[in-house]
């Protein structure tokens, strides 16, 4: 690819630039249109009149239009989302009302279940009580009989044995005494008779002596016969053992005690069994006493609910963002006119400055046109090219800049940047909308809380009323059934006390005043009293604990499952009872808004990808230019002798009119690739090129000239130091506003 091609030297000769002009036109003085003159091109004021349609203002207005379209679409999407959310809310409201009315529908079944449970429990309890009462009755009677019979046996053993021994001792003592007294009396009589005989003999001797003295007395007689007769008549009274026999005959058999105790013990048991038998088939739980909660009608989709407030807030945010975007972008579009006006003024000056290059014949006309028509991109190319060494690389760098900054390429880049800026504006708006989505989620969670609260209130009221019925049932059963149990325990306790008292009375009547009374009372307390106390303690425990207590219904009977469902929302893959199965969002209502925001986000992402692709396409163009320039930079061009062409621009040198005809087009001019200093020092408009033709077959001068010549053979158009030439332009502005250049006369 050649950047500037000219007619090869083998072509027919053409007159050099300006050869056909008269001598005075070969170096014409720069001329400009007078102020106010009509020109076919736009003047300074005309250019300023179109500042308002500069590219940046237009781009900002296009961005504004795209943002307004996005805002309109977002409003439409939010309106659609609101309709869907309200529809979903209505469905949730209906489902929530149905759930809140669950106690109404479930209470009948639960009430029937509770009533049946109570009936079966009471019937089973009565059957058990009937069997238990009968068993306890027989056990108590048996135990009391065991105690009384045992005590009777012990008393009979102790008292009868003692009395029989005592009677035997008394009888033996009486027999022994009667026999002994007879023998003693007979012995005494014999002793007294012998003693009396001896006394009489003794007295007879004494009387014989006394008769000698003249007196005689009769001896006294010892007469104890009467006393001995009394002694013989001593006998133990026959009534000595009558008391013992009476005691033996009066030992109680406790038949009356047993009969009294049995009757007293069996009476309460009979009454309890009678009551149980009467109530066993008659008990029927009254189901009408159970409460039935009313149906619930929830309403959280009205005018003052969170959904309308959420979408109202979203609409307010969108409206505010729309106003902000309109104000900012319009202000930016208007503000862009100021720097663009300054740039247009500068461009106009540069164009007038560089327009003088067109009149010079020592520059590539195409390059000059490019510099004049694209002042900023060409200036950028010149600036960047100045970083490299003079020569082909500078030309290639300028060509890269020119290739990447063509009008289509810049339009592509500007379109991509504007698209990204539009996406950024839409993303800001979408971010503001998405920030409010958690608020809707909170509102929806409050819907669930409302459902659970209503459900919990209904469940609690039902549980309170049901528990009151259960408490009344407990009291009724405790009074009708266990009331007799308490009465029976009290009666049995009293009966045992009466039994002990009656037994004590019998013993007092029997052994009162005897030595056996104390031991028998001790035996009674040890054998019966301690046992009776144990029975009384047991009866007291039965009295204290003999009552039925059916369990109450918990307050969360109908709301427990809903509460657990909400509690499980914080776990992985939650599925709220307000959400449809398979929803990945918190609930169906939030899913509507999330779906809309995700659709808008996908659209923004698509636009961003398209804009990025446009920018990437511009970079691809830049890469193509760089690769092409690198290829040309490192490729050696063929010399003319090998079939190559001279790609270097050689402007004709200004000559006199008479010399034009003698100049051949085939002459080769030694044109340096860099700017040549002005030898005259007059600040020329542009660098001058050497017009010394190469003399074929002659010497080229020094080796340096030879190297320059070889380098210049491969030159390209546009390698001239235009920037230096332009910098050397001395311009000024006259009082009338006309731009005058350094070469102009003042």
UniProtKB/Swiss-Prot annotation:
Family: Belongs to the PRM1 family.
Membrane topology annotation: Multi-pass membrane protein
Positions on the Cytoplasmic side per record topology: 72-138, 345-398, 628-746
Source organism, top-level taxon: Eukaryota
Coiled coil residues, start to end: none
Sequence segments annotated as region (Disordered): 1-32, 682-708
Keyword Amino-acid biosynthesis among record annotations: no
GO BP, sorted A to Z: plasma membrane fusion involved in cytogamy
Organism: Coccidioides immitis (strain RS)
Keywords: Cell membrane, Conjugation, Glycoprotein, Membrane, Transmembrane, Transmembrane helix
Predominant localisation class: membrane
Spans within the Extracellular topological domain: 1-50, 160-323, 422-606
Glycosylation site positions: 178, 248, 277, 457, 486, 493, 508, 555, 570
Gene: PRM1
Transmembrane listed as a keyword: yes
Protein name: Plasma membrane fusion protein PRM1
Residue spans crossing the bilayer: 51-71, 139-159, 324-344, 399-421, 607-627
GO cellular component entries: mating projection tip; plasma membrane
Protein location: Cell membrane
Described function: Involved in cell fusion during mating by stabilizing the plasma membrane fusion event.
């Amino acid at each position: 690819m050649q950047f500037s091609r000219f007619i090869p030297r083998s072509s027919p000769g053409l007159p050099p630039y300006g050869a056909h002009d008269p001598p005075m036109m070969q170096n014409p003085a720069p001329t400009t249109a007078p102020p106010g003159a009509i020109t076919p091109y736009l003047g300074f004021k005309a250019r300023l009149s179109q500042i308002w349609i500069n590219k940046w203002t237009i781009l900002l207005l296009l961005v504004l239009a795209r943002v307004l379209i996005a805002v309109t679409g977002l409003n439409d999407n939010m309106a659609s989302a609101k309709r869907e959310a309200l529809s979903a809310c209505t469905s949730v409201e209906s489902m929530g009302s149905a759930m809140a009315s669950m106690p109404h529908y479930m209470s009948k079944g639960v009430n029937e279940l509770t009533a049946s449970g109570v009936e079966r429990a009471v019937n089973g309890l009565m059957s058990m009580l009937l069997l238990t009462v009968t068993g306890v009755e027989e056990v108590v009677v048996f135990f009391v009989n065991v105690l009384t019979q045992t005590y009777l046996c012990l008393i009979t053993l102790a008292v009868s044995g003692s009395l029989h021994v005592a009677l035997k001792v008394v009888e033996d003592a009486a027999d022994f005494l009667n026999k002994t007294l007879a023998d003693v009396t007979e012995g005494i009589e014999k002793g007294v008779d012998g003693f009396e005989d001896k006394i009489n003999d003794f007295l007879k001797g004494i009387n014989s002596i006394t008769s000698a003295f003249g007196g005689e007395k009769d001896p006294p007689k010892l007469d104890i016969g009467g006393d001995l007769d009394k002694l013989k008549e001593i006998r133990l009274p026959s009534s000595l053992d009558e008391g013992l026999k009476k005691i033996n005959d009066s030992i109680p058999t406790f038949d009356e005690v047993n009969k009294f105790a049995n009757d007293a013990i069996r009476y309460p048991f009979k009454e309890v069994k009678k009551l149980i038998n009467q109530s066993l088939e008659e008990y029927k739980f009254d189901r009408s006493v159970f409460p039935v909660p009313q149906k619930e009608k929830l309403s959280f989709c009205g005018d003052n609910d969170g959904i309308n407030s959420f979408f109202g807030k979203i609409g307010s945010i969108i409206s505010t963002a729309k106003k902000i975007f309109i104000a900012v972008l319009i202000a930016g579009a208007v503000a862009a006119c100021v720097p663009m006006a300054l740039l247009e003024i500068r461009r106009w000056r540069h164009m007038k400055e560089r327009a003088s290059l067109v009149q010079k014949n020592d520059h590539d006309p195409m390059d000059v046109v490019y510099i004049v028509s694209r002042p900023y991109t060409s200036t950028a190319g010149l600036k960047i090219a100045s970083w490299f060494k003079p020569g082909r690389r500078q030309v290639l760098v300028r060509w890269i800049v020119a290739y990447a900054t063509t009008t289509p390429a810049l339009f592509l880049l500007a379109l991509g940047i504007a698209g990204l800026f539009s996406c950024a504006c839409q993303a800001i708006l979408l971010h503001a909308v998405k920030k409010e989505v958690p608020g809707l989620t909170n509102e929806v969670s409050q819907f669930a809380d409302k459902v659970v609260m209503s459900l919990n209130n209904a469940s609690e009221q039902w549980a309170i009323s049901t528990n009151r019925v259960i408490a009344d049932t407990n009291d009724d059963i405790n009074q009708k059934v266990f009331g007799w149990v308490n009465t029976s325990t009290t009666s049995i306790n009293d009966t045992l006390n009466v039994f002990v008292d009656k037994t004590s009375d019998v013993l007092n009547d029997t052994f009162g005043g005897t030595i056996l009374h104390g031991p028998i009372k001790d035996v009674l307390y040890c054998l019966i009293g301690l046992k009776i106390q144990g029975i009384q303690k047991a009866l007291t425990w039965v009295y204290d604990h003999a009552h039925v207590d059916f369990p109450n219904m918990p307050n969360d009977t109908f709301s427990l499952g809903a509460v657990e469902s909400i509690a499980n929302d914080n776990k992985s893959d939650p599925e709220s009872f307000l959400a449809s199965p398979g929803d990945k969002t918190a609930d169906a209502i939030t899913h509507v808004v999330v779906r809309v925001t995700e659709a808008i986000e996908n659209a923004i992402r698509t636009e961003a990808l398209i804009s990025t692709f446009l920018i990437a396409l511009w970079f691809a163009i830049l890469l193509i230019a760089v690769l092409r320039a690198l290829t040309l930079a490192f490729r050696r061009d063929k010399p003319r002798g090998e079939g190559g062409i001279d790609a270097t621009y050689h402007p004709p040198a200004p000559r006199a009119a008479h010399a034009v005809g003698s100049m051949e087009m085939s002459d080769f001019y030694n044109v340096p690739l860099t700017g040549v200093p002005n030898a005259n020092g007059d600040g020329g408009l542009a660098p001058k090129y050497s017009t010394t033709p190469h003399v074929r077959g002659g010497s080229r001068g020094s080796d340096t000239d030879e190297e320059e010549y070889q380098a210049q053979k491969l030159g390209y158009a546009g390698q001239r130091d235009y920037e230096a030439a332009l910098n050397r332009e001395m311009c000024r502005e006259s009082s009338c506003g006309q731009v005058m250049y350094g070469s102009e006369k003042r």
